[in-house]
Regions:
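Active-site environment of non-heme Fe oxygenases that use a 2-His-1-carboxylate facial triad
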Residues: 2-35, 40, 45-265
């Protein structure tokens, strides 16, 4: 697990796609730490399609296969403004949210707007140690999340923390933007909000935020059930265009096994 002194490792786009030994190193690091940056990628729209040979097929969502992020005054999503975007993960409104996200910076000519990432597992580990009762309620209390537009609707009612049979953390669902109103008469709602307040304070604490600038040709790859992403406010005095797409960790882990075994044939 890591906190604010963490810096992701960088891997060349060309080497990642063309050299199996580099792909093995990059994917292994990604699975272990939850984040890598691929640099020197083409600043060309839809280049994320080319990562399928290493990451597996793009995970389709209802809205767009590859999503464009730039300042647009006609949408409701805070990502399309120049305001600070707090740490979150995407599509908490899916029963199974995409487990990997790639954010490809095509152009970044604006001042400010550093990317922020948070190791959600580090936050939850510390919360579990300090306030086990908060951790327990967040692991069991179902929370509604919704994302929709004129044509599509996604809705999930799930706890924010996912555990396996051994009570190990296997997923973190966190999005203030998509979280919906909770029935005030629901059992344990007061305990939930007390725990949620503590969780929000930690997620937004400088203690956990790693910050760095994504330049043109950089692709930030995050393990989306673990790592939250966001950005600082920026001045919309130039062009800033980012594209993102989703993949699945199961496919990436499978590809790593194939890469390792193919070298032994």
């Amino acid at each position: 697990y890591w906190t604010n002194d963490f810096k992701p490792n960088y891997f060349s786009w060309h080497d990642f796609l063309q050299k199996d030994e580099i792909a093995i190193d990059a994917i292994s690091d990604f699975i272990t730490r939850g984040v890598i940056v691929i640099n020197d990628a083409p600043s060309i729209s839809n280049s994320l399609e080319e990562l399928a040979t290493r990451l597996g097929p793009i995970r389709e969502v209802l809205f767009e296969r590859i999503h464009n992020v730039s300042v647009d005054g006609h949408v409701y999503n805070i990502a399309h403004t120049s305001l600070e975007l707090p740490p979150h993960n995407d599509f908490a409104s899916y029963t199974w949210p995409p487990s990997v996200q790639a954010l490809h910076m095509l152009v970044n000519d604006c001042e400010g707007g550093r990317s922020t990432i948070v190791d959600g597992y580090a936050v939850l580990r510390d919360l579990r140690n300090d306030y086990p009762e908060h951790f327990d309620i967040l692991s069991n209390f179902a929370v509604p999340f919704r994302e929709f537009d004129e044509e599509n609707e996604t809705y999930a009612n799930e706890p924010m923390i996912r555990l396996n049979a051994e009570k190990e953390i296997t997923g973190f669902r966190y999005s203030n933007q998509l979280m919906q109103m909770i029935d005030p008469k629901k059992k344990n709602v007061d305990a939930f909000y007390e725990a949620y307040h503590e969780l929000c304070n930690r997620v937004n604490s400088e203690k956990y935020k790693s910050k760095f600038r994504l330049e043109s040709g950089h692709i930030l790859l995050v393990s989306a059930h673990r790592v939250l992403h966001g950005r600082e406010e920026f001045k919309p005095d130039g062009k800033r265009h980012l594209q993102d797409a989703y993949y699945e960790m199961d496919n990436i882990e499978n590809n790593l096994v194939l890469l390792k075994t193919s070298g032994n044939k």
